[in-house]
Amino acid sequence: MGDTVVEPAPLKPTSEPTSGPPGNNGGSLLSVITEGVGELSVIDPEVAQKACQEVLEKVKLLRGGVAVSSRGTPLELVNGDGVDSEIRCLDDPPAQIREEEDEMGATVASGTAKGARRRRQNNSAKQSWLLRLFESKLFDISMAISYLYNSKEPGVQAYIGNRLFCFRNEDVDFYLPQLLNMYIHMDEDVGDAIKPYIVHRCRQSINFSLQCALLLGAYSSDMHISTQRHSRGTKLRKLILSDELKPAHRKRELPSLSPAPDTGLSPSKRTHQRSKSDATASISLSSNLKRTASNPKVENEDEELSSSTESIDNSFSSPVRLAPEREFIKSLMAIGKRLATLPTKEQKTQRLISELSLLNHKLPARVWLPTAGFDHHVVRVPHTQAVVLNSKDKAPYLIYVEVLECENFDTTSVPARIPENRIRSTRSVENLPECGITHEQRAGSFSTVPNYDNDDEAWSVDDIGELQVELPEVHTNSCDNISQFSVDSITSQESKEPVFIAAGDIRRRLSEQLAHTPTAFKRDPEDPSAVALKEPWQEKVRRIREGSPYGHLPNWRLLSVIVKCGDDLRQELLAFQVLKQLQSIWEQERVPLWIKPYKILVISADSGMIEPVVNAVSIHQVKKQSQLSLLDYFLQEHGSYTTEAFLSAQRNFVQSCAGYCLVCYLLQVKDRHNGNILLDAEGHIIHIDFGFILSSSPRNLGFETSAFKLTTEFVDVMGGLDGDMFNYYKMLMLQGLIAARKHMDKVVQIVEIMQQGSQLPCFHGSSTIRNLKERFHMSMTEEQLQLLVEQMVDGSMRSITTKLYDGFQYLTNGIM
């Protein structure tokens, strides 16, 4: 059994008839698992290997054969994966495994000792339990990741690698950092089990390819430079960037030899021009971007991409599909590095606006914003809306990005460029002038501009001869329809009976809304982001859309992103995953805690992008702009104590405060000054900046020794120590901790896997994981947990170190 070699390749379905997809035996499997759950955690590795070898027998038998998709069509297998977009999940175990108990009984010799017979029977039972667990509905992606990480048997690892194809893409994507970190830093068997799935998904999605390439580079940076160059992570990253993993139908396409309309070029000249432009896509713009010495390990990216584009140019194929996006990202990062050299916030803001104005000369292009959740093309960056955020040493900045949503990024043509002076604001179809743009005009819009030496072919953009303006669908009398709305038309969805609303209630609510309209912040040259962040998101979208030449298009969307240079966002990504997992746990357990995980894109070990929290400003900005206490600000924004708006905002504050207090305790989040705590328009608080978690603290000063930050101002908003909402806050803390410890393994494994091979400061010390587990207090009763929560709340509220750290931040950084 130990000599058997397991081939951890992707699933290659056989032509044998199958008994149905896994998990179809629902009831009986679940009952067996429930009865034997106490023994599942102690499974003999030898038994596990035998079980999974049997399950993977079909894979080994067909090594070198032609796989067949679930539709009956053959699949090409390149780099260990099929081209077809549909991969069939593992079938039920072969018949010999389902009948293993009978076979075991037949093979036991009559003269075998009773001890040996008992061992075989126990092994058979454990093997059956393991297989049934893997095939049951209880086996989710979290359990798959756990077995992949903890198992030492190639058979188990290969089986789990193939089972990844059965899970939803978004479920696996959540664990992508863990999968890639295991691929880089664990043994070959784990890597061989993971690679087929990664390769398959890279063929399907260009965004997945980008994320894999970025994460592989970032998580390989902790390795020694000589080891890194030859590591499996670097090789897979090169494979992705070389464009070998693009869909087969795209890879086989040749550039069209027919000239586009109005180009005035012969077919031969035009083909040569496109080929040159595409092949040099990754070189031209990056040639003038300043490199920083902060991360010399990744300076070979340009060389790798350059060599890959040369081979593509020689093979006369389509351009490297990731090259335009990588250039777009590098341009944004280069802007941040240049801003950091300027002394004042005002100079940084002016430079940012001018840099983004130049950037617009390259748009629209085949680029996208990776933090978005839908396919789109970037068409414009409203440069005057960008702001520099607060930072003492660096220059993170916030930009808004106009995009056009599309069904498929790869197959949809890049939108035509509409000049800024052609269309400003379109309120009706009649106001739309007939717009056309010639090829010469389009080329002019991508002409060489200052600070970008000879970069007019840096981003791959589809050649468009004539602009086609897509008109929105006309809805007649849409304004009149609003005025015709009446109370009589409001009906219950279930009973269809009229719903009567008291006129007094309507009048009272309207008067409350008019009396307590959210205040606007004054413009501060030292803090220009305050005004931009305070503006309601819907109002900002409306205003930018009216001033955009693309705003009349029905698929126009506005996105925002924070660009950070000089910061390692890998810890931020880890914190995002933990918050997302806790949010899911509390929803599953129906605990009304509120937290707001925001997306993180790790670009390298010292740069990245962050999804901004809209309709939110920091408590520091609130106190500085309003010169009010937190409670008085709530009263100003939401009305008096008895209004619906105030009571709703107060409840939101309590639920979010309790949620983030638990997060800060479990992850030991530090650097909790008022600049890192946001307050949104609905009363929630949102903690940001998780750069100091677990074993790390700012400058190792050790100021913050309390479990979490709970100031007297927070308690005042809750109604004081004797208020019902303060008791509600403590009850939520207890319920949230009880719910979290029920699912401790799901949280701990996220952190534990990322510690593998990592040099991040949050993992310094050998007791990081042990201390994390201890904070779940698995051995305590609920009564003991309640006492613990009382002690933590009391200690945090009276903590002198919290006050000292706030004072330190005020003296050194001016944070109130």
Curated annotation (Swiss-Prot):
Gene Ontology terms: cellular component: Golgi membrane; mitochondrial outer membrane; rough endoplasmic reticulum membrane
UniProt-annotated stretches for the region Interaction with ACBD3: 2-68
Region (Catalytic loop): 668-676
Biased composition (Polar residues): 278-297, 306-318
Keyword Acyltransferase tagged: no
Family of the protein in this entry: Belongs to the PI3/PI4-kinase family. Type III PI4K subfamily.
Protein name: Phosphatidylinositol 4-kinase beta
Taxonomic lineage: Eukaryota, Metazoa, Chordata, Craniata, Vertebrata
